[in-house]
Amino acid sequence: MAATPYGKVSTPEAYDFACFEGALRERIGDAFDVLQSAQVTIMGCGGLGSNIAVFLARCGVGHLHLIDFDHVEASNLNRQQYRVCDLGRPKTEALADLLHSINPFIDTKADQVEVTDDNLRDLLEGADVICEAFDSPAAKAMLVNGARLHFPEVPLVSGIGMAGNGPANVIRTRRISRNFWVCGDGVTDVNVVGTLFAPRVAVCAAHQATIIMRLLLGLADEKLDG
């Protein structure tokens, strides 16, 4: 394959082959097509959600629905995938731009809204996997309850317990019930520990992105994945 000019990718096909298709087809057969057609809805675009979105974009997931009501603040820069030039922008907008800088041909939908019981069902419509990445325990509970009520057949992946600077190896992926996985140490709450560090948040986000990928590819295993 010819060298790519600096800062340019000529076609979607060239990008897909260079980044994903050759390796994925060789290793997992039709996985590339599965990932390209998949939609993951990410609820919350902070430390977990922004990292998860970047991981999935780099793995070739074709459709990402980004949902968050907030704007980028300076306090976000220590652990979230935003830059100084993003300060003041809606997180969904800034994250979508970042994803398109990684993969110009990814399909993103950005909703800058606060998730409530009233709009939850409409926001989750069409998702192949639902990813919970909220900060607030109340918002997490509302999403989990609503998703299990309205879309019990859609896998839900949640993150709980990644605060502080404890060991990374206690962060795990656990299958809580049918179609419901939780990633984290299940203990460390930022309201108790008081700090969030980029490496530990990213470890939890990587766990979430990994089980999402395994679910999309039909590889999730009850014994191996909690």
Residue positions per predicted region:
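A structured beta-alpha segment of the ubiquitous adenosine-cofactor-binding alpha/beta core
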Residues: T92-A127, F134-P137
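Conserved S-adenosyl-L-methionine
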Residues: R58-H63
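Glycine-rich phosphate-binding loop and adjoining beta1-alpha1-beta2 segment
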Residues: D68-I102
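Hydrophobic/small residue at the entry helix of a nucleotide-binding pocket
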Residues: L48-G49
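N-terminal charged helix/coil linker that caps or initiates catalytic domains
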Residues: M1-V40
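Glycine-rich phosphate/adenylate-binding loop
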Residues: A2-A14, L123-V129, A133-G226
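Hydrophobic Val/Ile/Leu positions in short beta-strands of Rossmann-like dinucleotide-binding domains
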Residues: I42-C45, L66
